Amino acid sequence: MTTDTRLEYDSLGAVEVPADCYWGAQTARSLKHFAIGSQRMPLAVIHAMARLKKAAAIANRDLGVLDPEKAKWIIQAADEVIAGQWDDQFPLAIWQTGSGTQTNMNVNEVIANRAIELAGGVKGSKSPIHPNDHVNCSQSSNDTFPTAMHVATVLALQERLLPTLRHLLTVLQEKAAAFAEIIKIGRTHLMDAVPLTLGQEFSGYASQIAAAQAHIEYALQHLYPLAIGATAVGTGLNAPAGFGDRVAAELAQMTGYPFRKAENPFAALAAHDPLVMLSGALKTLAAALMKIANDIRWLGSGPRCGLGELRLPANEPGSSIMPGKVNPTQCEALTMVCVQVMGNDAAVGIAGSQGNFELNVYKPLIIYNVLQSIALLSDAAQSFTDHCLVGVEPNRQQIQAYVERSLMLVTALNPHIGYDKAAAVAKKAYSEGKTLKEAAVELGYLTAEEFDRWVRLELMLGEKGTS
């Protein structure tokens, strides 16, 4: 950026702007007055906003509101923003006006100045393209920003998170099938329990991910309705009839996703319940991933002094002081992401409750946290799947040793000798270091042959194919 400046003007007067920048007066004022934190408006929102400006230019042109030549320059400039050509022209923090007005104007100014340049004009002149009169024609920040929020979120879900979850689910299902015949001891309350198969255990993980994915896909359906056309308070003031429907249709054609104008524009401005719902679904996914990652790292603990039922792939040396140590780092990274997503959901829930009258003014905070949750979950789940889960293998020797030592196999005797006698068998075996069979026979509750007939692992597993 050069030190040369130019003067740009808004309703408050003149503002100095770096000469080589495409933003204008309102962006410059925001940079001056809202130098808060390091969090910038996500580029996903900027690109979604540029898609919206392109769709609006097309709709305004077709409705006779915008000159076709002006529309052409706006569309070309918007395409450049969508392509990421001007990503460095969007410097604003998320800590700004709660309606996202400053970001809306940042996009308007950049597109307008680039369109002016394409038309052969002078950057900053507002001629032949004006950021408000032409780029923002038929729009308000109050309907454009929430529209961009939905578009950005849908794209992030469809193109990042959902494909990652499908990959994760496939690997979990493959592991469940591969481990279907490996009998192990279950654990409840962190204590030994009755047996199940390792495949059954992994089928539970797969079911959790499938359910979380379904919750996200349900929430996704509520993000297709868009606020565009509502303008300032939901009445559509200054927007031509049919504008919102046309813009939504253009966005649907551009993206391939079924966007449509919201049935109730007032709720679309004043509340962000669909994003709150989605954030809750993301938290549910985080809870599932936390449980899965914790189980896998506990089952892989050791190698000699832990549970050691699973062998996890080594990604890197684990300690700067203990040679040969390898840690479950993919599980650790994933669980940290899950904690962050849960925190983000708390912020989104509070922000979503703060819609006063006709407008919620926590929009930048909501979209920042939702998009961060999607990005973190996408990246972490992909990393966990590719660098840990696919390489997980059973330690059959350790698993079998636990099965042979388990006292909870005594549960199979309950129907034959009763709970109290079965408990006495387990107590005697534990206190005297005997096998269950030895203890049961010595107590006179059954014969060795009866024990072998009744305590059979394959009869204690239920439906091994349960998923």
From Swiss-Prot:
GO BP term, pick one: fumarate metabolic process
Fetch the InterPro entries from UniProt: Fum_hydII, Fumarase/histidase_N, Fumarase_C_C, Fumarate_lyase_CS, Fumarate_lyase_fam, Fumarate_lyase_N, L-Aspartase-like
UniProt-annotated binding residues for substrate: 99-101, 130-133, 140-142, 188, 320, 325-327
Question: Major location, coarse class?
Answer: cytoplasm
Q: What reaction gets catalysed by this protein? A: (S)-malate = fumarate + H2O
Q: Where is the active site?
A: 189, 319
What is one Pfam family matched by this protein? Lyase_1
Keyword Cytoplasm assigned to the entry: answer is: yes
Q: Read off the SUPFAM superfamilies from this record.
A: L-aspartase-like
Q: Which UniProt keywords apply?
A: Cytoplasm, Lyase, Tricarboxylic acid cycle
Gene Ontology annotations for the cellular component aspect, listed alphabetically: cytoplasm
Which pathway does the record list? Carbohydrate metabolism; tricarboxylic acid cycle; (S)-malate from fumarate: step 1/1
Record site feature (Important for catalytic activity), residues: 332
Which compartments is it annotated to reside in? Cytoplasm
Cite the GO molecular-function annotations of the record. fumarate hydratase activity
Top-level enzyme category? lyase
Subunit architecture: Homotetramer.
Something else known: There are 2 substrate-binding sites: the catalytic A site, and the non-catalytic B site that may play a role in the transfer of substrate or product between the active site and the solvent. Alternatively, the B site may bind allosteric effectors.
Q: What is the recorded function of this protein according to its Swiss-Prot or TrEMBL entry?
A: Involved in the TCA cycle. Catalyzes the stereospecific interconversion of fumarate to L-malate.
Q: Which family does it belong to?
A: Belongs to the class-II fumarase/aspartase family. Fumarase subfamily.
Q: What is the name listed in the Swiss-Prot or TrEMBL entry for this protein?
A: Fumarate hydratase class II
Say which species the protein is native to: Thermosynechococcus vestitus (strain NIES-2133 / IAM M-273 / BP-1)
